[in-house]
Amino acid sequence: MKCPFCGHADTQVVDSRVSEDGASIRRRRRCLECDKRFTTFETAEVRMPQVVKQDGHRAEFSDAKLRTGFTRALHKRPVPTPLVDEAVGRVKQKLLQLGEREVSARQIGEMVMSELARLDKVAYVRFASVYRSFQDVAEFSDAIREITHDKD
């Protein structure tokens, strides 16, 4: 690997450690030319599937859009950010485990609803009202019955 200080092409790995989450490797390197040390991180490159929208067009998967869906539904709800991060990670992991090149926006929405049902019932109903385009109060009642029935 090229030294970031002097640009020399040869560096030596001094130490390697697996990160706490096991998803990356931290390496300490030493430049053989200028003798300076630096740290690199090695992670697996994964490709998220393309998202097929309701109208049929395709878009790149957006981590930001996924996170925004969660944060809007959870706005002013007592759910800590680390729990939201874990839920976002679970949805991304499920998408990768599908092993598909394309996934429908509907599938992603259902995964988000499943995670919200675990995190916060009010957020679930908020998300469902937009995602399922509720037209009247009866649809809210149905969603509330659905989520409270799942709890029993």
UniProtKB/Swiss-Prot annotation:
Keywords: ATP-binding, DNA-binding, Metal-binding, Nucleotide-binding, Repressor, Transcription, Transcription regulation, Zinc, Zinc-finger. Its cofactor is Zn(2+). Negatively regulates transcription of bacterial ribonucleotide reductase nrd genes and operons by binding to NrdR-boxes. One of its GO terms (biological process) is negative regulation of DNA-templated transcription. This is Transcriptional repressor NrdR. It comes from the Bacteria. Binds 1 zinc ion. Residues 49-139 form the ATP-cone domain. It comes from Laribacter hongkongensis (strain HLHK9). One of its GO terms (molecular function) is ATP binding. Belongs to the NrdR family. A zinc finger (unnamed) spans 3-34. Pfam families: ATP-cone (PF03477), Zn_ribbon_NrdR (PF22811).
